[in-house]
């Protein structure tokens, strides 16, 4: 069901809503503040003004930041302090985030502020949402965050357009934020006390990466099952290892789910061996798909749990607690520390890398006639020597799998002290998220290469089976989808365009969707 409206209250934002806003057109769905959120925001903003009137010393409101935490700011400079944090912290480098990630960042940050513990004014949160709904997207360099105190540098870039600084992308054009505001008839905001800090201090960037990449990993997980089954059919393997009774004796729920998925995909196939005494079991890369892919599903489920919580967390510092009588307490803490997210991102990265490792080994088996016991010709070509066939397809997969082994090294164990050793342990959560994004990109390509080779192998097997050839209930539609765009490769030709096509089918979720239509019951 299409999501047409997202109401932010700081407590109920879902992963599906974030994805709808991230990938939707500006204003579809429209994002608004809930009435309760408006009340909370206004109450906390008034509490900040009360603190100033009483001369209370509070971090980031009447003091400097980081190592300057004990430098008290004069009352007539507190607003300048908030301007200064944006311009001094907007020092990110590297390519800018894509628009879906940028939109997710803006939405998540607004939801955090909507909880009413950060002290920003209502007009500030609403301006951020106005930008989101109008499709005014800040240009946010992707590198520069340590993941504590939150994502300072990228969030400073996100906030710059609120005050008429920085660059935005709007209606397909990159332009100064001031120009975009002028065209809309909007005045730049003058930040009040606490607002610059509240906009920049939090985990919205690593959380946005986590939400988007978790969703991509879910699609890849389903695609990996499909690729594995198509390879098993091409290799004349046996589905005996997917028997429900076997998996019930090792009751990891997602291993059991994966095995059931494989059975549904292969239901009705004549390409597999059943009760063949000459071939009682396959190599690990086929036989152990449920154990490996199931473990990856566990990592994905854990990541989804983490990011579902973080979407509705308040990750600012300090936080304001206002009671029913209007009394306020300011508490300095560490909710900005991204360790829970960084560990989840690292965990998901190494898990998804395993999908690529096992897929590359299946691809090797498809191309090596010795490994596949001559079920398929060497490198999937009849005229080997004159033709190289799929030889270098496997090389590319091997290169990508090897790159992922480097990328899978965890970022979260590699803290580095900053701010004169005041901020002496950091999470490196955005680094973990960017690595995860690269791993997922690579695995998407590896699975495309496996599907390309498996479809080629199926055609060789089809020649052998003749009129008896029938693919599984789930694998058959996927094979047909591939063959709509990519032919059987009878002799050497330029393969790259075909790889690009299948890669797009994988990335767009069309491979998973083709099988899912036929995945409505257990086998």
UniProtKB/Swiss-Prot annotation:
Note the position of the cross-link 5-imidazolinone (Ala-Gly).
148-150
Biological process annotations from GO: L-histidine catabolic process; L-histidine catabolic process to glutamate and formamide; L-histidine catabolic process to glutamate and formate
Modified-residue entries (2,3-didehydroalanine (Ser)), positions: 149
The source's domain of life comes to Bacteria
Cellular location(s): Cytoplasm
Please tell me which top-level EC class this enzyme sits in. lyase
Similarity comment text for this entry: Belongs to the PAL/histidase family.
PANTHER family referenced in this protein's UniProt entry, alphabetically? HISTIDINE AMMONIA-LYASE (PTHR10362)
**What is the name of this protein?**
Histidine ammonia-lyase
This protein's species is Chloroflexus aurantiacus (strain ATCC 29366 / DSM 635 / J-10-fl)
